[in-house]
Each structure stands twice: as structure tokens, then as C-alpha cells.
């Protein structure tokens, strides 16, 4: 009896280790990018500003990490956000705050909800950088794989 109990415990422990290892193997870090410019705004403006974003999403921890570089704006940035859900050229509300008066490079992390992650993974998020001259957004870029 004692041997079969130990054997059952060891088999259960081995199965638990296999399940845990399999779950870790499913974890994934997805890399996204965005190219920001005035022409990507639904109503383009004459800004010469440009930017790029590198964004990663860890599917296990649900952590979003970003670095956004930008320059050539008409003035200091006043706000920056991730917006969504929206297709390219469409507007949407703020999904996630990047910062107030951000400077380049703007860096940050956040934990996403399942709905936010689904919109991000579906290509329905964009980054918008605002200035006093372009309060609705001066440069914008869709976040894509």
C-alpha cells in the first residue's frame, strides 16, 4: 500500500511539472511597431513631426512595454496616448495614457485588460501625440506587428 501511495504522489507531481512547463512554453512576447506622422491623422495637418514606436506585449504577465521616439513637432508635446479600438484613419477614445508633456523617448509599462489586449492584438490601437497647435493630435501611428 505504501509503495502505491508514493507512486501515485510521484505521478501526480510529475504531471503537475509537465503542465506547468507546457504553460510556460505557451507564453509569448509579441513585438509591435508604429510609424507616426501627420498624414496618419484622420484630418492631416502640416506638421513635419515624425516618430517611431517599439512596443512589446507579454501574453503571460499581460504587460505592455513601449519606447516612443519623436521629433520635429510644432512645439512641446502636451499629451500622448494609446487610442482604440479603431481601424487606421478612424478615431477612438483613450485606451491607455502614455504621459502628460512627454519627452522623447517616452517609455513606459502597463498591465492590459483582456479587452485591451484583444484590441491591441487585432491591430485596433494607435498612438497619438498631441501639441498645443494640434490638440486633437499632431502625429499618429497604428500599432501593428
Kindly give the residue locations of the regions a language model identified.
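Metal-centered catalytic cores of metalloenzymes
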Residues: 2-5, 12, 17, 22-80, ...
Amino acid at each position: 500500500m505504501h509503495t502505491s501511495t508514493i507512486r501515485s504522489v510521484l505521478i501526480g507531481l510529475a504531471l503537475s511539472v509537465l503542465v506547468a512547463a507546457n504553460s510556460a512554453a505557451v507564453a509569448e512576447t509579441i513585438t509591435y511597431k508604429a510609424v507616426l506622422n501627420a498624414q496618419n491623422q484622420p484630418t492631416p495637418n502640416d506638421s513635419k513631426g515624425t516618430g517611431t514606436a517599439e512596443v512589446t506585449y507579454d501574453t503571460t504577465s499581460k504587460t505592455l512595454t513601449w519606447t516612443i521616439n519623436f521629433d520635429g513637432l510644432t512645439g512641446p508635446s502636451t499629451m500622448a496616448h494609446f487610442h482604440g479600438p479603431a481601424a487606421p484613419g478612424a478615431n477612438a477614445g483613450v485606451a491607455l495614457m502614455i504621459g502628460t508633456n512627454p519627452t522623447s523617448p517616452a517609455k513606459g509599462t502597463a498591465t492590459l485588460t483582456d479587452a485591451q489586449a484583444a484590441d491591441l492584438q487585432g491591430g485596433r490601437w494607435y498612438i497619438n501625440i498631441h501639441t498645443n497647435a494640434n490638440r486633437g493630435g499632431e502625429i499618429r501611428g497604428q500599432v501593428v506587428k
